[in-house]
Amino acid sequence: MKHFSLNTLLCTIVVASIAIAPCESDDKLITQTCSKTPYPAQCISYIKADDNSKDVRDVPGLGIIMAQVLVLEAQAPKDILFVLLGAGKRPDIQVQLKTCLESYSFIIKTAMPAAIDSFKIGKPRLAEDYANTAALVVSKCEKSFNGKSPITNENNVTHEVARILGAIAKQL
């Protein structure tokens, strides 16, 4: 009876070790990758919030997740800008609103799909360029309002995510 219990215990330990090992390595990959970005804690938080992160085994996979995060984060300011433009209550800022809306549309519809494709085909420099461009156009959007846009918080978050994405791509 003792022999059976010992074998059962050993089998349980081996199976548990195998099941836990990938999780530890995923956490290590995420932590190591995010530690080389300008916002490590936010990077870890964004990536771990994505259910697919547990299946990612390499840095390009983390880059794809961050590009998807950028699309999601860019959607809120785009929606706000669209509503503000439609309301037409502030004719003095219509040009800036339209320019910012076009920038966010570019990020969502062009830059991030291209960045994701760049990671998939092994061209991380292109992904880095798209991320840096996204950060730049968001900064220009905010500056066009002298730092007091109706979407300052959203611009800051989008800029942060774009910088994280650029830093991840640069590691490749």
Region annotations inferred by a language model:
Residues 1-27:
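Terminal membrane/secretory targeting segments in land-plant proteins
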Residues 24-172:
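Folded extracytoplasmic luminal domains of secretory or organellar precursors
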